[in-house]
């Protein structure tokens, strides 16, 4: 099958591309930057921004399915950037699918689209979208997901996946930021005992292929969203510490009262808004909410409809992570 992966040069995108190639699919990708490593694998690479309707239209020509991974993530407060990438970009993909008669679309969403600031203990896909969001990222991802699911039809079967806190070898986002804050002594969590679930990169990528396979066969996933994680919820402190130790770092995780963290975040956000800064604030309410609440999910729907079953456990994933940097589990090597 000819598959276009938007954001194919990113952490998740590259993992999906490699798995598609491994099973014999013909793969193309659209990215804002050049990725010679993808071209070396035989991937047809298109340069362009997902918010550029013309670029997306051209990239979608001649493909049979799209896996839409490209997005702007983070706790930033400058809404126009998130609207352009996450809402307009997704609409561009939907329009291009319609124009070119593409039959299948798998959209990478986020569990944050249903996180309203409270605990989510084993929540399933019946969770509603909240009325208010703490940041533009979850708000725009929720709108994008709604559009994708609403567009599902006999002509274009769509579904959305909500992978949670993706990590693993090659991560250039979550883990580097975690290490930076730890080394600076700024890694503080409001509720270290709260359970959260994460997902290893290979499991997250494979779920996208399984979703595509469902759409091209039974189609039972069409018009639906699915939580994707490892199914191994752990206390916030434990998972942060184990990720740091896999990199040979000594965890310096500290506790801070939620009320204090939220008050500081509110002040910082106020300054960021006054200055109209487009960069991520050093502390944001969106981040505090996620570190102060439980969020792990019932994977029954993904297992039933997609055949999803995380192959790589957290323990094995940590071993692979340690091997990437030449560290033996639990310390430097």
Model-derived features: where do they sit?
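A conserved pocket-lining segment of Rossmann-fold NAD(P)-dependent short-chain dehydrogenase/reductase
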Residues: 128-131, 180-203, 210-211, 215-222, ...
